[in-house]
Amino acid sequence: MAKKSSVEKNNHRKELVKRFAEKRKALLAIANDESREMEERFEARLKLAELPRNSSATRIRNRCEMTGRPRAYYRKLGISRVALRELGNRGLIPGLVKSSW
């Protein structure tokens, strides 16, 4: 089980990303638009730098919904390999069978 503070920190980052998504997208569009003047693009970059660091999507860590584990994360299911194995052994994931050969 991951520390509650780590999970909460990540949840706070997700919230910030949602809150600043539109503003960040608009500023990036201005900054990357080569048809605009260099000064205008530079100002957009400065405004982008003033946004909170945690409002960037790259700072979000994929974590298991059940345990908060940050590694061995299956995106399709939203859980870690450990949680996947536990649920699979209990028969709670349809179509998942233990392999044997």
Swiss-Prot record:
Q: Which InterPro entries match?
A: Ribosomal_uS14 (IPR001209), Ribosomal_uS14_bac/plastid (IPR023036), Ribosomal_uS14_CS (IPR018271)
Q: Which GO terms describe its molecular function?
A: rRNA binding; structural constituent of ribosome
Q: Coding gene?
A: rpsN
> Could you tell me what this protein is called?
Small ribosomal subunit protein uS14
What job does this protein perform? Answer: Binds 16S rRNA, required for the assembly of 30S particles and may also be responsible for determining the conformation of the 16S rRNA at the A site.
Which key words tag this protein in UniProt?
Ribonucleoprotein, Ribosomal protein, RNA-binding, rRNA-binding
Query: What is the organism field in this record?
Result: Methylorubrum populi (strain ATCC BAA-705 / NCIMB 13946 / BJ001) (Methylobacterium populi)
**Can you supply a Gene Ontology BP term from the record?**
translation
Gene Ontology annotations for the cellular component aspect, listed alphabetically? cytoplasm; small ribosomal subunit
Q: Which family does it belong to?
A: Belongs to the universal ribosomal protein uS14 family.
This protein's assembly is summarised as: Part of the 30S ribosomal subunit. Contacts proteins S3 and S10.
Gene3D superfamilies, per the entry: 1.10.287.1480
